[in-house]
Amino acid sequence: RFKQSQIKAAFSVNSEMLQFYWSLGEDLVKLKAESKWGDGVIKSVSQDLQRQLPEVKGFSVTNIGYMKRFYLLYSQIDSIYPQVGGELYLIPWGHHKYIIDKFSSEPQKALFYVRKTIQNKWSRAVLLNFIDTDLYEREGKAVSNFDEALPMPQSDLAQEMTKDPYN
């Protein structure tokens, strides 16, 4: 039970941290929209946070830039599908950074890899492998007539079964 509690606590901390990163990213986007500030905003925020919270890591200029990109990428989806927000907080920040690097202008692909990571409990190495081997494209290529031949729930299930992530 102790290990279970530790795992739950780690997930809770991760979720809270990601929610903070989301809100900071949102604040940065709003600050930039309301002012004439450029990249100096991120540097200034980074320095302020490091000065106020010297014991906390993760407030480098690079990481704060990722927070802004995190918000920009997923806010496109969140405005259409608000329930997605909760999913975003279920995977580690390091996973998000790789997804952001690869799909900063492709929110649907980014969300696909977030969901696959959650469903399959992928490590960062496994996630990178599936990104590098373009799982998103491969899973969409299974050709069938299941939609015409089977009723709705069965056609979806049959289609899913033909998709091979290792192909």
Predicted regions and their residues:
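Basic, low-complexity intrinsically disordered segments
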Residues: 1-167
